Amino acid sequence: MTTTHPETAPLLDEEASVQRAASLCAAGRFADALALVESLPVFDADASNAIVLNIAATASLALGRLADAERWWRRCIAVQPDFADAYNGLGILLKTLHRHADAESTYRRLLTLRPDDAHAHNNLGTVLYAMGRRADAEAAWRRAIALRPEHAQAHGNLGVVLHDEGRLHEAEAAWRTALALRPDHAKSHTSLGNVLRALGRHDDAAAAYNRALSLNPRDADALNSLGGLLHACGSLADAELAFRLAVTVRPDYAQAHLNLGAVLMALDRASDAETSYRAALAHRADYADAHYNLGIALHALDRLPEAEAAYRQAIACQPKLVPAHNNLGCVLRAQDRLSEAADAFRRAIAVNADLAEAHNNLGGVLKELGHLPEAEAAYRRALALRADYVDANFGLAVLLLASGRFDEGWARYESRYEQPGFVHHRTRSLLHCPQWRGESLAGKSVLVWQEDGLGDMLQFGRYLVQLKATGAAHIAFACMPALRPLFARVPGVDAVLDHDDAAAQSSRHDCWTSLLSAPFHLRTTPDTIPPPLRFVPEPARVERWRATLGASNGRRRVGLVWKGNPRHHNDAHRSLPSLAALAPLWRVPGIEFVSLQKGQGEDDARNPPPGQPLIAAGDGIADFADTAALVELLDLVICVDTSSAHLAASMGKPCWMMLPGRDVDWRWMRGRDDSPWYPQTLRLFWPRDGEQWDALVERVADACAAWMGVEAVSLP
């Protein structure tokens, strides 16, 4: 008779259970595997069976019980320090927990046990890459490939780091090797497409993305990358579709929502873009780029306080996000918070001293604040960083002209022709004759083209006479209808045309120029400014206005203009709020006021304060010839910075101009209350430090009383 030892059967059952648990793990039945090993007598807090502990840890990791998994693997290693599989599993866990330093040391311990383990080298490379150690990661992946050339994942990972390093041709080779090993791996086709796009091979990139989508039509990464390529190529509608498909497939794909917003902004759909950016933030609240782009959309929608908040949130998420600091400065500037804007631009520069845009923007704000030397330094720094920076060149030009430094200022002012946002940029393609570059005009036909405002033409019209004096045989002036009757009476102007006719006939001329280019080519300095045109009003119009105004009954007549063109970029600052702001003038006796307002401000003029002698002449003004005839009958014009000042001063009428507290036009220069452009006729009233319009108008009223030789009276 054969007997059986009592302990033999349980040992066989335990071994079978461990093997069964291992098989369950391999089959993905982790809960069953864990339940089985936990039922074993050897499995307790002091368990010493390394294989059992490894199975328990592996199943716990798969079930998301990460703390248990770490505990069991560390116990396994304590029990059997040379158990390589435990180090491998623990490394994967630590990498998942983003405990990269611990993961690195774990993988390095594994490699002391299995130095030729290609998978371990690959995983080590992944950890090193996550720690920002790209060179070490590359070395690890190359070692994995050397040990196992068919390791497709290692080739792909190598492609990632090579792309990051800008070694695009090497990256392409790595991805092509990965795809040769795994031709149906959609993600690898997408990554190859990203490299090809970076190489500028857009057709090849599109083919790679489409191959990825043929393998997996719901590949959100491929859809997102394809959308980016289509956006870059200008296929905005197709790009929108690709991004919308990406977020449909993966609604929480924050980057695709961000990219959809960007293409919607390119389509001028800022409200829709806002929705996309907010969707990105709903899925990733700390997404700095989404906060930043939301700020751009809100800024475009003129919701400035909200845009400011978005930029500040972007900075809170990513303090060194330079564009957010720069754009915050822009939105603060738009809210007239100039000192805060300057601080924001300085913070952008502190993070990136080579950001030309921030230096240029700082220059603009400092110029508006009146800090001209500092503004000049900022503009010059922007140009040192980017010599072809048109905005900075033009900003410096304006500053130099305002400072009376005409030699360099006029030369830089020509940069307006390189500014795509300026009307001047389009003139060159519109006219079919050469632009005048300063060569002799003797015997030539010159087309003078109005590109700038009405006031500019009245101020610089003096150069029509100068051009004729250089020997030009024929001067044709293309201008707006409101100017044509006035300039038709200017000596030396042979033809006054509308813009359409002038453009159609431009090939008949030897060259074209703008009046504001003439000072550069004729080398005008503050001491050699030509005298203004003396516009001579038509006698018939003067008599018509004399009849309209009637007898003055011994009172002096003063023309008033308190508002300019509402489309002017600085109108909000240079125009008075309303006629009521001029109330201090009503205290000066012996004056009859005449409103020269046309358009904006006419309603105020038609409904003056009770008892105030104000004649509203706007209804009868058809063009500048009418305004000139009316000004001829006045003794003084008091105005803000508008074309009326140029007209009155050109006619020799005394003109007092009230200037705004910020963004004063360069032509009025700095530090003087007169103008070399209109000597003896123009008087400038600058705001004193912190002075608002009401106080400035009080000073004008005092000057008016002194001019009249009377005492101002108190209003009831």
Where do the model's predicted regions map?
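Alpha-helical solenoid repeat scaffolds of the TPR/TPR-like class and their adjacent stem/linker regions
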Residues: 1-716
